[in-house]
Amino acid sequence: MTDVEQPVSVEDQQAQAQSYYDQVLGNAYVQTAINAYTKTKEFHPLLNSTLNSAEEKVSTVGNYAAQKAYDGYNSYYVKPKNTAYEAVSYGTERAKTAVESGKQAAIVGGTFGIGAAVVLTQFSLALSAGGAALVLEQVDSAKKLGSSAISTIKEAELAVEHRIFSALHQAQRIAMVPVEKITENTNSLLDILDGAVQKGLNIEVPPSVNLTIGQRVKNLASLIVQGVSNKLFKAHDHVIDPINERARNYLEQLSQSFVLLDIVREKKTWVIEKSNELSTSVFDFKKTLEEEAQKYKVAPEEMLMKHIQSTSEQLSTQLQSLREKGQNVFGDGTKIDSTIDYLENLKKNFTDAEDVYKVRDEVLNEGRQRIAELSTWTTSLLIISAEWQFEPEDLLIEELYFDAPPPVRTRNLYRNRA
């Protein structure tokens, strides 16, 4: 039976965190990131309020960078490693055997644990937003091209196969698996993935007896596409689509507000008659504002300001709901958090400005850019969410999250596909 790691105390966790902070802050890659972060603030003063509010939670830029890195450490190393142990203890004998044979096959100093953590980290794309995006992207392309469902599924399965082989290769490179143990180690890691898929997607993964590595990966990819498709479309129908629709309505109102705001500021007065500069939808929106202004006995310019503040707050609420209810599909919510921070600052900027003519130009310029980005994002939310996910080359995982030794001579993992 494999020994399972015991939970560590709070004090030990804090000591581990501090040690990791120190390691991260001394890393050249992180120093480069901190420098870029600081320069971004210097050259884009408008971003200061958003970034400063995030920094206040951890007091300094350095600690902020370290906190983000440590969050990554937990997300991309600790959690996947724990998932590996969960998969092992899930009740499948093949997974138990996998770790035992892995220890014999691989490995000295716990590098099988690292390999299992890395493969689950990279592979988690196939179980969360990235996998959903892969499937959805193929389905969406098929609709546009009129392709058959069979060819669409096949393309999605091939994409997931590529992810699996990439994850295996990354794990074995970092764990420095000896060449003569590649096949045995690959099968062990695939056993771990079988357990993770079975638990994560709640589907039965049949035993892989006397199958080649290529056959195992192909079968696993097929099961993943089926499982992710079911998960994805259920989430879409019952959670994501309704919230996303409300968010897009608020976004459209915000967009109309900015169009009207630009014209009012340019003319230095409220636009009374219909203008060629106003689309029908914006003109109708203007009439609604005028009716509300008359009802509450305020100037239409003031009503426009209040509407922008209110819409920003409502859009922020919808995005927060999307983040909470859609987290099992999207995974990391960094992009949503950043947008929510921006909307809160937008509301504050308009409150501080007092009237439409005192709003700073840079606030409006960034607002127009953000609205365009949000419109694109909410139009194809799940496909765009693939950009939030991590790739080995994006994370520089061996440089940032692991104190990995230099790579050994090149190994040909793919020769075992046949």
Swiss-Prot record:
Its main subcellular localisation, reduced to a broad class, is: other
Q: Where is this region: Required for lipid droplet localization?
A: 211-275
| UniProt entry keywords in alphabetical sequence | Lipid droplet
Q: In which tissues is it expressed?
A: Expressed in intestinal and epidermal cells. Expressed in the muscle and hypodermis.
Q: Which domain of life is it from?
A: Eukaryota
Where does the record place it? Lipid droplet
Known Pfam families for this protein?
Perilipin
**A Gene Ontology term for the protein's cellular component:** lipid droplet
Which biological process annotations from GO are given for this protein?
Answer: embryo development ending in birth or egg hatching
What does the sequence similarity comment in the record state about its family? Belongs to the perilipin family.
Q: What does this protein do?
A: Lipid droplet-associated protein which plays a role in lipid droplet clustering.
Indicate what this protein is called per its UniProt record. Perilipin-1 homolog
